Amino acid sequence: MDKYIGKRLDGRYLVDELVGIGGMANVYKATDVSNGRIVAVKILRDEYVQNGELLRRFKNESKAVALLSHPNIVRVYDVNFSDRVNYIVMEYIDGITLKEYIEHKGILDWKEAVYFTVQILRALQHAHDNGIVHRDTKPQNIML
């Protein structure tokens, strides 16, 4: 069992379940016990906490996303950086990834492909307009 499941982060975020595994962090579904809101908590993996470069990238990601406000970009609610655990609390999207959608549906028709592409490009344009380049844009990182 994952060491974070069932635990509270800083007495506020009750970690419910693991929902995603990334290259340097895991994403959990959690409950903000202060208001009952369901959130996503991205926790930097323990093996990377002592890696200065990866920790810097993780911190930069949280700062960058926190500055963005766009309907196609998840909101950041909170961040924590400490010796114990480093995490970003974000809006929870109850859905599937674009990768999962394509695997289930198969080849997209052109109208659907254009629709998704426009939404993705609007989000990326907003990020670029704010000086941010998303370095990991791929179907498994896009929630529907």
Q: Can you say where each PLM-predicted feature lies in the sequence?
A:
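Flexible N-lobe loop architecture of eukaryotic-like protein kinase catalytic domains
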Residues: 20, 60, 69-72
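Activation segment signature within eukaryotic-like protein kinase domains
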Residues: 116-117
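Activation-segment/catalytic-loop signature of the eukaryotic protein kinase fold
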Residues: 79
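Conserved short submotifs of the Hanks-type protein kinase catalytic core
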Residues: 83-97, 101
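Protein kinase catalytic-loop region centered on the HRD/HxD motif
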Residues: 120-132
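AlphaC helix of the eukaryotic protein kinase fold
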Residues: 45-67
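Conserved N-lobe loop of protein kinases adjacent to the ATP-binding glycine-rich P-loop
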Residues: 31-38
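Protein kinase glycine-rich loop
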Residues: 16-22, 27
